Curated annotation (Swiss-Prot):
Residues the record marks as active site: C155
GO biological process: L-arginine biosynthetic process
Protein source organism: Brachyspira hyodysenteriae (strain ATCC 49526 / WA1)
One cellular component term from this protein's GO annotations in UniProt: cytoplasm
Cross-referenced Gene3D superfamilies: Dihydrodipicolinate Reductase, domain 2, NAD(P)-binding Rossmann-like Domain
UniProt-recorded name of the protein: N-acetyl-gamma-glutamyl-phosphate reductase
Protein family: Belongs to the NAGSA dehydrogenase family. Type 1 subfamily.
Amino acid sequence: MIKVSVIGATGYAGAELIRLLLSHSKVELKNLSSKSFVGKNINEIYPNLNKNLDKLLLDENEIFEDTDVVFASLPAGLSDDIANKCFEKNILFIDLGADFRLDNEEDYKNWYGNEYKYKNLHKEAIYSIPEIIKYDNVYNKKELKNAKIIGNPGCYPTSIGLALAPALVNKFIIKDDIIIDSKSGATGAGRELKLNTHYTECNEAFAPYKIAEHRHTPEIEQTLSNIYGEDIKVTFVPHLLPLNRGIVSTIYAKLENKNIKLKDIHNTYKNFYKDSAFVRVLNIGEIANLKYVKYSNYCDISLHMDDRTNKLIIVSTIDNMVKGAAGQAIQNMNIALGLKEDEGLNFIPPAF
């Protein structure tokens, strides 16, 4: 059995990791840590774990003993020391935070206000959206199966990268005219108390936030640029949905070829993802719906064309806690350790 530990176990992504790992046939959940709840039982914090898990929450420094894999789900700037300890102990480290997502340290400084503490570790790290890493002109040179540090992608970049990768690889769209309108459930903001996620603030409300300044912007642009092979800038506007979980991204891009048919683009997308366990390209005429990916590691993509404006419109839906966080982290672990990619993740989402 693979011995797995989780740092930041009481945040939303950490709790989702625990839920999914408990169903993984190759994993033994070893140690859990939480800065806020050291000494408490995890099932005191999350009663859904009663009769499924009985573990005390440890100090972070106690996590590394008798462990093969460490997941960390922490705010930006807190993962470098953990990664260094894991690297020294030959433990696979998977970071669900932002510290190992950006290639360029200047971007990390500008958007997160931090510097790389161990620059050599950032050269070792692999950023992986598994379905499209082979098209990434930076990270496809590294072997995920031999990774020691994995930067798990953010939720918005995952939904957007999967939606746009086939169009960019096949040069269907003009790279300088991409508009992205994304909506996320409240769990995307984390468990920490914030005014805009109070029930009375977000219930029966719907509004954009962090317009033109969301921290996922450089990660989105990096992912798209690495795939296309040239620098890409996008217009990205996120919105807060009055839901617990899920992301819907609606993407608008001008077509390079006015004569291309939607069926040809659709066939290319179907072929692009034909071997993917988790990306579902819907039939022409169907529209991706958040309802059918919740609690799953699936990404649903629907394709549409506006002939009047020569625009390709792509709708992408994921569960931000699963494919956008914990599920994708487990998917990356599976690949890195030579397991079946869908191990512990191959379940059908509820219909309602």
